[in-house]
Amino acid sequence: MEIKHPATAGTLESSDIQITLSPATSGVAIQLQSSVEKQFGHQIRSVIEATLAKLGIENVAVDANDKGALDCTIKARTIAAVYRASDNKTFDWEEINAWIN
């Protein structure tokens, strides 16, 4: 998949994360805002990077605003943002379920 235009998934509610993706030309750049960044920033970035890699996304700018989201929520929001930003309307749920657990 390829990021074609900016897209957002998630909210700024407690226990959620808002992920905004934009096209980029050189790699994955993650801008993270989180009240728990010192404790969990590395883990949040790792989950986002791993999810993007599973989806084949190599060039993207990520703006993540975390409000205490669990890993499963971070994965779900990242997947939703990628599908929106790539205009992909075909979901292979069996494949996604196989690697998100």
UniProtKB/Swiss-Prot annotation:
It holds the Pfam family ACP. The modification O-(phosphoribosyl dephospho-coenzyme A)serine is found at residue 14. It comes from the Bacteria. InterPro entries: CitD (IPR006495), Mal_deCO2ase/Cit_lyase_ACP (IPR023439). Keywords: Cytoplasm, Phosphoprotein. It is found in: Cytoplasm. One of its GO terms (cellular component) is cytoplasm. Oligomer with a subunit composition of (alpha,beta,gamma)6. Belongs to the CitD family. HAMAP family: CitD (MF_00805). Covalent carrier of the coenzyme of citrate lyase. This is Citrate lyase acyl carrier protein. It comes from Lacticaseibacillus paracasei (strain ATCC 334 / BCRC 17002 / CCUG 31169 / CIP 107868 / KCTC 3260 / NRRL B-441).
